[in-house]
């Protein structure tokens, strides 16, 4: 059985004999998440934060509302979609102990290719303590960048081509091992939120990636840094058009050169 989906990215829900899944048809003419997120070569690639939006929409499609927690979101292979082509992507939520297992697969002539996996569970906790923005700004007084007529440039733009929706950085203040930034969607794209996007992939992408300069030895000329996994992420609600992002560098993991948390 097939039924239409209600969220922005998904086209339909498919109910098979043994398994049900949600489908999205990815191509650059339909999804700005692809068209505005490209390698320097021009090749469109689905952003890591796009998987988080897919997960949030999948929960909504299944009637699972309220705060939730993502654990061990792991990226297994990139999802490239050449211009003029399309990829059918399946998102499966399977009940398991304490929550659901998430799998993201693309359809190919030889079968399914797995791109990402995660665990997700609903939260029944109180509202989180609000970030003390003034205190964070006071600590991070080493260097401040403020946007003028145009948004600030993201460090990753040396290796990626970002579209207009990714131009969201309004200010960054760096401290020792931490940074805080103000980000806002351009007025032309606030309507994305009205369409039902919960965790806007462009806004979230820059919110989690603007502070690469905190990493010891980071040099964008060395190549593109990409997310490998999100260990834990708690989502208490949809992102508004304007947000603050506080990033702290965790050096306790001892991952070695080329890795950071």
Regions found by a protein language model. Give the residues of each.
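Acyl-thioester-processing domains in fatty-acid/polyketide/NRPS systems
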Residues: 1-261
């Amino acid at each position: 059985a097939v039924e239409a989906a209600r969220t922005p990215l998904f086209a339909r829900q498919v109910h098979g004999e043994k398994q049900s899944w949600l489908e999205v048809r990815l191509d650059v003419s339909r999804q700005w998440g692809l068209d505005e997120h490209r390698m320097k070569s021009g090749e469109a690639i689905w952003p890591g934060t796009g998987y988080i939006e897919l997960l949030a929409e999948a929960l909504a499609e299944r009637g699972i509302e309220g705060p939730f927690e993502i654990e061990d979101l792991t990226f297994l292979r990139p999802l490239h979609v050449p211009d003029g082509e399309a990829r059918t992507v399946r998102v499966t939520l399977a009940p398991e102990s304490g929550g659901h297992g998430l799998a993201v697969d693309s359809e190919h002539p030889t079968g399914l290719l797995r791109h990402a996996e995660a665990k997700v569970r609903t939260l029944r906790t109180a509202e989180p303590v609000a970030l003390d923005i003034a205190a964070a700004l006071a600590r991070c007084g080493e260097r401040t960048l403020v946007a003028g007529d145009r948004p600030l440039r993201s460090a990753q733009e040396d290796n990626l081509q970002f579209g207009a929706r990714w131009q969201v950085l309004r200010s960054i203040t760096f401290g020792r091992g931490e940074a805080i930034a103000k980000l806002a969607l351009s007025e032309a794209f606030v309507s994305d939120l009205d369409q039902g996007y919960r965790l806007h992939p462009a806004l979230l992408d820059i919110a989690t990636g603007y502070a690469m300069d905190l990493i010891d030895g980071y040099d964008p000329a060395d190549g593109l840094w990409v997310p490998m996994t999100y260990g834990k992420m708690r989502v208490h609600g949809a992102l508004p058009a304007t947000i603050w992002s506080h990033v702290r560098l965790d050096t306790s993991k001892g991952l070695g050169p080329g890795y950071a948390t």
